Amino acid sequence: EELDKIVRATTSPDGAVAADLNLCVRIRVSSDHSKLSLASKFGADAHEMKALLFAARQAADALGICFHVGSQAMTPAAYGEAMERVRAAIVEAAVTVDIVDVGGGFPSVYPGMEPPPLQAYFEVIHRSFESLPISYSAELWCEPGRALSAEYASVVVRVEKRRGDQLYINDGAYGALFDAAHLGWRFPVRLLRDRPSDTRDMPFSFYGPTCDDLDHMAGPFLLPADVGAGDYIEIGMLGAYGCAMRTAFNGFGAVAKVVAEDEPMATLYGGPEREVARSNIVTL
C-alpha cells in the first residue's frame, strides 16, 4: 500500500513512472538488546519481505533494506542478529540490493548504562555486511544520532526547594528531562559551587516546576548531602533528545543557551581512533 502511494506520487502527469527512485524497505527486527524499543510502529515482518522487496525492486533505481535495533543498544550482537534477518530476506526474495542501512541505536554512556566501545559495534556490522549476498558496489549506511549528540549538551538547573531527599528544580519532565521522568533514565549530575562541598554524596530524586505530579525524576541522582535551595546543578549528557523535546507547558521553558568548550561529563570516545576500511576501498 505505501509503495503504491510512492509510485503514484512520483508518476508525472503524462503517466511516466519515476526512474530515479531510491527506496529502502524496513524490516522489523528485535529490540531485546536495547533500552527503548522501536519495533512496534514500523517495519515489515519477515514473511512480508519477499513480496515487498520484489515489488520495490521493480519500482526502484536503487533498492535498500533498513532496520532499527532500538534506541541505546547495549550489545553489538543486536546488529549481528538483525543482519542475519537481512540476509534471509535477500536470499528469499532473490533481488539485488544496493543499500543496507543499519539505522540508529548506537549508544552513549549514562549512569548504570555502560555499553561496550563503539568500535565493537562497527566490527560486527562490517563483518556482517561483508558476508551478505549483495553487489560489490552496495553501500552501507548508518544513522548514529545518540552516539554523536548525547555528549554535546548539559542543562544547568537551580534548586528551588529541598524536602528531605527530594529536590525541586526549575526543569523537568516537560523540559529537557523527559527521559529521566518517563523512561526512568539516570543522567550524570554535579553540584556547581565556587568551593567544592566537603560532605558525602547521597541519592536524591527531582521534581520539576510544573503542576503535574508526573513531573518527577526518580533517579537516584548522587549529590553532596548539603545541597539546598539556591544551589545550581549541572545535568549532563542531554544532547540526545533532551533539548529537542523541551516544551513550554505551564508557561515554563525559557532558557539561556551558552556555548562552552569543556569536556563532556561522560564519553565513549576516550580511546584511540581506528580507521576501518572495506577491501574494495582504494586510496589514490
Task: Explain the meaning of each model-derived region.
Residues 124, 139-284:
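Charged (often Lys/Glu-rich) extended helix/loop segments that serve as interaction or gating elements
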